[in-house]
Every structure is written in C-alpha cells, then in structure tokens.
C-alpha cells in the first residue's frame, strides 16, 4: 500500500501559551516556536516522532480544515516506549491527571493484534489524549 503513515494532524487551540506549556512539560519538541512568537509564521507544531501536530492558535483559521475544527475536537493516541509505570510517572511528574487506564486496547500495530495498554488524559483545551504502551513492541507491517 502506497500510504505508509501520517505526516501531521491539525489541532486548534483556545490558548496557545497554555498548550505550549502543557506539551513542553511532557517533553515534546516544539517546531517554529520562535518564528511564531516573532510573528514570522502563523502556526507552530508539536513534534511526535516523525510526525507532527500543527497547532492553530487562537484567531487563526486555516483555509482548509474540518467542519468542526474547534479547540477540544482532537482525539489522539501517542505510542509510549517504556512501561505503563514509566508512562504513569511521566504524566504525574508533568502534573497531568490520568482520567482512565491502564486498560487493554487494540492499536494499529500488527493489524490490531499487538497487545497494548492505554492511559488517558486531557490537555488544557480538553482534547482527549491517549498513551498506548505496546507489550511486545512489534514492528511488523500490514
């Protein structure tokens, strides 16, 4: 299959500063933050592995977007490399409240057959965030 991954998703925010603080506390790298602060670009992004989350700050409306692209509309699952306990510790140290989990889930690896556990939280815009921890970390392609 020629489509092999996700390059980026877009996420609107009601408060860019609050969102930046939240994701930086979790250890994410921010792309174009300085250029955004200087007014050279209209958006910044959160790096996630080889993919990114394009953040649309308050007041910015993308010309191409989903019909319900408003703060809080995003539901995203991150893959965490480590144990459930390490993920819980990372979230707790960042001041993030776990709202559910750990519980078994079927992720995309192994065409939904790889055993995994997930933890759930929300960011400052109330987006649903999931951290999936694969038990065997398989890398088989479909």
Which residues does each PLM region occupy?
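Short histidine-centered beta-strand/loop micro-motifs
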Residues: 33-35, 64-69, 110-112
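Vicinal oxygen chelate
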Residues: 2, 5-15, 44-47, 65-142
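A short, sequence-level motif marking secondary-structure junctions
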Residues: 57-62, 136
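Core segments of cupin and vicinal oxygen chelate
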Residues: 4, 11-59
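N-terminal beta-strand motif that seeds the catalytic metal site of vicinal oxygen chelate
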Residues: 1-18, 26, 74-76, 132-142
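Active-site/binding-pocket entry motifs
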Residues: 52-53, 61, 97, 104
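Short secondary-structure capping/turn micro-motifs that flank functional sites
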Residues: 39-40, 62, 107-108
């Amino acid at each position: 299959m020629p489509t092999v991954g996700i390059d980026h998703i877009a996420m609107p925010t009601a408060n860019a500063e609050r969102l930046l603080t939240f994701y930086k506390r979790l250890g994410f790298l921010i792309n174009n933050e300085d250029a955004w602060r200087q007014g050279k670009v209209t958006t910044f992004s959160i790096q996630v592995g080889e993919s990114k989350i394009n953040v649309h700050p308050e007041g910015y409306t993308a010309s191409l977007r989903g019909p319900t692209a408003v703060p809080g509309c995003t539901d995203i699952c991150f893959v965490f490399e480590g144990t459930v306990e390490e993920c819980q510790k990372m979230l707790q140290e960042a001041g993030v409240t776990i709202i559910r989990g750990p519980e078994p889930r079927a992720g995309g690896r192994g065409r939904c057959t790889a055993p995994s556990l997930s933890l759930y939280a929300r960011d400052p815009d109330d987006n649903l965030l999931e951290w999936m921890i694969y038990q065997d970390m398989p890398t088989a392609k479909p």
